[in-house]
């Protein structure tokens, strides 16, 4: 019996010695906090591989404000279309002349209408010079004028030639003051009228969203400025439903947002969230929180590709000096120390983005426990077997 215990003791010592040398081979759910932090500590001579940023109130507020700026209210409410004419518009012109008709007694499309003689001119396209042509009047400049103003001009010029002329000008095809509305499977050009069309009118013009409302974003492009708002926010907040302007492009984007949770969080999973967005505190709640026995509260990380222009100014200079352009996306790791109570406030302002990876590192004590379990499980099992044989 003494020999058996002696052999077991020596087996334990030999196994411990061999496993301590190769303890890095212990299975783990991911890198430790120390290894992740070392990613941002590259030599100054080399191009840095990762931008490591500690999340504090200032960093969280900057990211929060950048998200808030994705608002249609930044464009201003604008104004309704004045209904003025422009190049490419098509006009319908009708002329009435009291009998006896002097100018429009025949020829063009004409008919009697009571005691007046009615003449319908062929549809007139506003030329590149901004004019339309009317018989006996000649070319008339119409760009920037309303149909009512144009008909008064024609009527005034015909008075000296026709018998009590009356004129009606109608816009039949608005090719200039319109908005492009783009959606998968259905895109239209929506004309703007004096009624004042808004963003939700454009959404309705293409039949709304083909997906769930919470998975749909609405993007508005005006000139060189692009803003994106969740359809949920657009419906819930009337201030976002601004008036559209000539040349605007409204695009409906259907793309379910997700982030991936990894590390000491129970199991790796992809978690969906609304296009309205998600804060880091909400994301950790959806992950089920941190595991008390495994996770390192000081090692909560968010991995994402961040546009260079969204980094703090002093950090942008470092990357620009290494040859990165303004359009580059920088691999960035945001570190959160949840052991600090202040971080709980920062996390409520820190926005999670589509395709983010949230990683929780293992606590050092959890690694020790895993190591001890890995070492002593086979020895204990072997000892039990030997004891059974001895008995």
Swiss-Prot record:
GO terms for molecular function: polysaccharide transmembrane transporter activity; porin activity. Residues 44-57, 94-117, 146-148, 172-178 are extracellular. Keywords: Capsule biogenesis/degradation, Cell outer membrane, Ion transport, Lipoprotein, Membrane, Palmitate, Polysaccharide transport, Porin, Signal, Sugar transport, Transmembrane, Transmembrane beta strand, Transport. The chain crosses the membrane at residues 34-43, 58-67, 84-93, 118-127, 136-145, 149-158, 162-171, 179-188. It is a multi-pass membrane protein. Its main location: membrane. A lipid is attached at residue 23 (N-palmitoyl cysteine). Residues 23-33, 68-83, 128-135, 159-161, 189-391 are periplasmic. Involved in transport of capsular polysaccharides to the cell surface. May function as a membrane anchor for capsular polysaccharides. Possible porin properties. This is Capsule polysaccharide export outer membrane protein CtrA.
């Amino acid at each position: 019996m003494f020999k058996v215990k002696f052999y077991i003791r020596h087996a334990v010592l030999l196994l411990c010695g061999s496993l301590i040398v190769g303890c890095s081979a212990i299975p783990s759910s991911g890198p430790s906090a120390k290894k992740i932090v070392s990613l941002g500590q590259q030599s100054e001579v080399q191009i840095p591989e990762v931008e490591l940023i500690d999340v504090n109130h200032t960093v969280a507020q900057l990211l929060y404000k950048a998200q808030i700026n994705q608002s249609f209210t930044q464009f201003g409410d604008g104004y309704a279309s004045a209904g003025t004419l422009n190049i490419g518009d098509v006009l319908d012109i009708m002329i009435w002349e009291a009998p006896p008709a002097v100018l429009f007694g025949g020829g063009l499309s004409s008919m009697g209408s009571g005691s007046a003689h009615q003449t319908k001119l062929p549809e007139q396209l506003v030329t590149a010079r901004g004019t339309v042509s009317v018989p006996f009047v000649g070319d008339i400049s119409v760009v920037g004028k309303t149909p009512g103003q144009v008909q008064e001009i024609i009527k005034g010029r015909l008075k000296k030639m026709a018998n009590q002329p009356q004129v009606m000008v109608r816009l039949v095809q608005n090719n200039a003051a319109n908005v492009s509305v783009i959606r998968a499977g259905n895109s239209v050009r929506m004309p703007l009228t004096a009624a004042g069309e808004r963003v939700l009118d454009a959404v309705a013009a293409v039949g709304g969203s083909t997906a769930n409302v919470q998975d749909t974003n609405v993007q508005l492009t005006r000139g060189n400025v692009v803003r994106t708002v969740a359809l949920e926010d657009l419906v819930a907040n009337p201030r976002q439903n601004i008036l559209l302007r000539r040349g605007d492009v409204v695009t409906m984007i259907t793309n379910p947002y997700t982030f991936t949770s990894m590390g000491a969080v129970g199991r790796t999973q992809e978690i969906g969230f609304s296009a309205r967005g998600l804060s880091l505190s909400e994301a950790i709640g959806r992950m089920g929180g941190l595991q008390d026995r495994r996770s390192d509260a000081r090692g909560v990380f968010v991995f994402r590709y961040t546009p260079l222009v969204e980094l703090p100014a002093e950090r942008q200079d470092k990357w620009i000096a290494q040859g990165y352009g303004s359009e580059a996306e920088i691999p960035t790791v945001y570190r959160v120390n949840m052991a600090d109570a202040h971080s709980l406030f920062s996390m409520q302002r820190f926005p999670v983005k589509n395709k983010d990876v949230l990683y929780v590192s293992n606590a050092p004590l959890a690694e020790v426990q895993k190591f001890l379990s890995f070492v002593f499980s086979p020895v204990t099992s072997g000892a039990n077997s030997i004891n059974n044989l001895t008995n």
